[in-house]
Design a protein with these regions (language model features):
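Sec-dependent N-terminal signal peptides
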Residues: 3-12
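Short S/T/G/P-rich N-terminal loop/turn motif that feeds into the first structured element of a domain
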Residues: 17-247
Length: 247
């Protein structure tokens, strides 16, 4: 009995150590990325009009109330011909994501899709960890979103990097930073080799410039910046975004 109790005590200590190993509990959500090119004779205005059709179709389904939508177009990008637009759906949970997918597939979504003025070449499902959120947008603002492919360095994983990034973001916000940050983990539909995709975004275009200057003036070289390690990133792509609902 004494031996069994000792084992139970060791097991309990190990569990506590594992639970307390990380500083923060990530705030997660699910997102879908629909990437494509406009059909002949169609453009962004047509896609924005089609959003109106989608919004009207979705309003009585009961599963889209907590979904946010943004439509992004590439601006600083290494291959502008590869895509014209990216439609992004964000859901609070994966259950909400798949409840919406079920409604789409069984309540008329495929029929509505026939009028989409864009042909998707990639559809990617992801899970995201929120590190920080941007300033509240003002009416009419366009957002900026920068996606970068990242790899973990030896000895680091998602939870370790998340804690370091969260520490950095908290310090950055104390200095006036208003950048939204996410660690995105792509799954179905993704054929790249990144461990995660970093998203940096601001709720206005000029906000990105202000925050970049703030980084070099106040954040670069700080202890929080020096502690932000364990990963490296490449291939940044910058988009202009139109928040359509819930952003």
């Amino acid at each position: 009995m004494k031996y069994i109790l000792s084992l139970m005590l060791v097991f309990s200590i190990n569990l506590f150590t594992e639970d307390s190993e990380y500083k923060y509990e990530p705030e997660g959500n699910a997102a879908e990325y629909y990437i494509g090119n406009f059909n002949k004779g169609k453009d962004l205005d047509d896609l924005l009009k089609w959003y109106g059709k989608f919004s009207k179709w979705a309003e009585d389904k009961g599963v889209y109330d907590d979904m946010s939508v943004a439509i992004l177009t590439p601006y600083f990008h290494a291959d502008l011909a590869s895509m014209d637009a990216m439609w992004v759906n964000n859901f609070p949970t994966q259950s909400a994501q798949y409840a919406a997918l079920n409604a789409w597939m069984t309540q008329g979504g495929p029929e509505l899709l026939k009028s989409l003025p864009l042909t998707n070449s990639r559809q990617v499902s992801t899970f995201q960890w929120v590190i920080s959120t941007p300033a509240d947008p003002e009416e009419g603002d366009l957002m900026v979103a920068i996606y970068t492919d990242c790899k973990f360095e030896e000895g680091y994983d998602g939870r370790k990097v998340y804690d370091l990034y969260k520490d950095f973001a908290i310090y950055a916000q104390s200095q006036g930073d208003t950048v939204g940050r996410k660690m995105i983990f792509p799954s179905a539909g993704y054929d790249g080799d990144a461990d995660f995709v970093r998203l940096l975004y601001t709720s206005s275009i000029d906000g990105m410039g202000v925050n970049q200057e703030l980084y070099w003036d106040k954040l670069d070289g700080s202890e929080a910046s020096q502690n932000l390690k364990g990963f490296s990133c490449s291939n940044p792509r910058e988009y202009i975004g139109r928040p359509m609902r819930g952003m």
